[in-house]
Amino acid sequence: MISNNYVPEWHISPFEHSKYTLVRNQDQFDLLFDDMNDTQEFMHLGAGAQVDYYDGGKHCIVQLGDCSERTLIEVHGLLLHEAVHIWQRIKKLMGEKKPSTEFEAYSIQRIAQDLFSMFQESETDGMEKQTN
């Protein structure tokens, strides 16, 4: 269940080309905008998860709704998928056409782990999961 205490925080990509965060509902999504006219409808694409880009891709907002019917493996799969999209955008911002496979793998791993951690923090029992 989504925690009412979760507040999205920006994470900075390796080499600081972009920032990314995870939101779980419209209220959290709206918190990220100074001007409410700039915001969109939460999960407007109707997918299991999605990432939207702002400021030319320098701000990436991953959206993931209620996951009570999904397994943790399924959630991690969705977040990993979105991590790859974030990496693809960062790669463009860096001007990298053919990064080494290790550089690419470590970058995606870092982004995915950040998203996994944010997901855990966003769940009502997130702190219990970290200590067990």
Predicted regions and their residues:
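Non-catalytic terminal regions of proteins
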Residues: 1-44
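Active-site scaffold of zinc-dependent metalloenzymes
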Residues: 34-73, 86
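Acidic-and-aromatic substrate-binding clefts and catalytic sites of carbohydrate-active enzymes
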Residues: 69-70, 95, 105
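Short alpha-helix boundary/capping segments
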Residues: 71, 75, 97-100
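Active-site recognition of the HExxH zinc-binding catalytic motif
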Residues: 77-89
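Post-HExxH zinc-binding segment in Zn-dependent metallohydrolases
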Residues: 98-128
